[in-house]
Amino acid sequence: MSATLRRLILLTSTNRSRNLSPPFLSTAVNHLSLSFSSVSSSPESHTSPSRIRTRTPLETQFETWIQNLKPGFTNSDVVIALRAQSDPDLALDIFRWTAQQRGYKHNHEAYHTMIKQAITGKRNNFVETLIEEVIAGACEMSVPLYNCIIRFCCGRKFLFNRAFDVYNKMLRSDDSKPDLETYTLLLSSLLKRFNKLNVCYVYLHAVRSLTKQMKSNGVIPDTFVLNMIIKAYAKCLEVDEAIRVFKEMALYGSEPNAYTYSYLVKGVCEKGRVGQGLGFYKEMQVKGMVPNGSCYMVLICSLSMERRLDEAVEVVYDMLANSLSPDMLTYNTVLTELCRGGRGSEALEMVEEWKKRDPVMGERNYRTLMDEVYFLNKG
């Protein structure tokens, strides 16, 4: 047996005597085992000790940290070690090694820390494996841990249903019930799928169920959550339900904001209740709130189609005064209805005025609008 091989075996046995040798196939241990095989299989190793590979920085860091974790280490010690790692692979090696030590078991805080480290390092496969371990009961339940899992699952298309599996497990627990953050994450994820009207109705049932369960669990929604519920109803044109939630906001100590009113204005206008939409818009003005661009444009087009042209023009000027620019469809809708109502010359004057107030319009769009008005007037 060569001197080099004896030194390596002595080093390994010393680590074992300290109960520090990891029994799993970590990155660092794999590298060390490779060096053993290269020594035993290469005939030159008996005569050339200089050919033995030096340890990588990852191996050195791993050995340093496991030596710092003295026998009898606690979950707090492991959490500190995990948080100190900038390399998620090294953190996972430490996490797996500590889990195999006699008398120790990871708690929810250790799993939470490791999952966050893996997410930060974009080790999504590691994260999914850890999540399955948690769901299988590898550690006790914890609201922060489960919310972290739900956040990750909601952000990944193929894990969307898994987020609700975790939520249902929280519902069945005695001491880890869903909190406001849980419902915020789930509702936000559902709302991202409200992109088409027929799809909206599919997910609206889930929104209703979450809302009922939130109330039954005694979770008080904030303005952000209530706005998401209002938005869900408004996008499905369930405007009476949206208005009901709007009126309940005061019961929860929440104040409606510009988003609340914008969702309501768009919803009732798309439902055909333009007068009610204008009423919400004026209520916003009284409170000093400014609608977003899409709210403005839906209201302008709805008023124009209802031949309430003076009110539509007034909203256009208010939109421009708030440094927001209508799109070409909105401009065309107003101008077309003006020309159809025999107010063609007024339409030409408005195009000139809008060009002065709208820096985004540009010369090309201005010419397009003027040509459209001339064409409509000739017809």
Curated annotation (Swiss-Prot):
One of its GO terms (cellular component) is mitochondrion. InterPro entries: Pentatricopeptide_rpt, TPR-like_helical_dom_sf. Keywords: Mitochondrion, Repeat, Transit peptide. PPR repeats lie at residues 142-177, 179-221, 222-256, 257-291, 292-326, 327-361. Pfam families: PPR_2. It is found in: Mitochondrion. Belongs to the PPR family. P subfamily. This is Pentatricopeptide repeat-containing protein At3g25210, mitochondrial.
